[in-house]
Amino acid sequence: MAQLTLIADGRATAPLGLPGGFALRSPRAADTEKLGQLYFDSRVPGARHGDAAEAIQEVRSFFQGEFGDFWPGASGVIERDGKLVAALLAVHRAPWDDTPDCPFITDLFTDQRFRRQGLARTLIIRCLTQASSTARPQVALRVDSDNTPAMRLYQRMGFGLRGPE
């Protein structure tokens, strides 16, 4: 399975209304364990790598800056009844040489029970809207080429294959 880098132009978009009972806010380092558990649980069993402890450590590494400078305004978590059900983690720029010089979504994940309700779309709109007001008004991300549902979502949201720089 190959990873593809996709990029979209940032644009101010009216936010989607969340379904009743959901709340959107910026993630905090205090959310690390809950985010890590959600990250692990959101993966289908065949696609999981490692265990919940490794997922929590990956989120901890994100907040420690290992994936770039955390951008709280473009990132988001969605809660329902006090439980995290979806998250998008973004940085001002990814630290890897092969990524575009623009904001980058490092992770986007949704509890399997809450998929197809517009939560990921709402989080992406928040990120694209924030990016639209920056000097680098684009957003990039990586996705596994065989992740058809994610590819469809990203294409509908305006993401396309990264062209030459």
Predicted regions mapped to residue ranges:
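A short beta-loop-alpha structural element at the N-terminal edge
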Residues: 23-37, 48
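Active-site rim helix/loop that mediates acceptor-substrate recognition in acyltransferases
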Residues: 52-85
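Conserved beta-strand in the GNAT
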Residues: 75-77, 83-92, 104, 109
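Conserved beta-strand-loop-alpha-helix junction that forms the acyl-donor binding cleft
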Residues: 112, 138-151
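Helix-loop element at the rim of GNAT/NAT acetyltransferase active sites that forms part
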Residues: 37-53, 66
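Conserved active-site alpha-helix within GNAT-family acetyltransferase domains
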Residues: 1, 117, 121, 145-163
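Conserved acyl-CoA
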Residues: 104, 111, 122-138, 160
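Acyl-donor-binding surface of acyltransferase catalytic domains
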Residues: 1-21
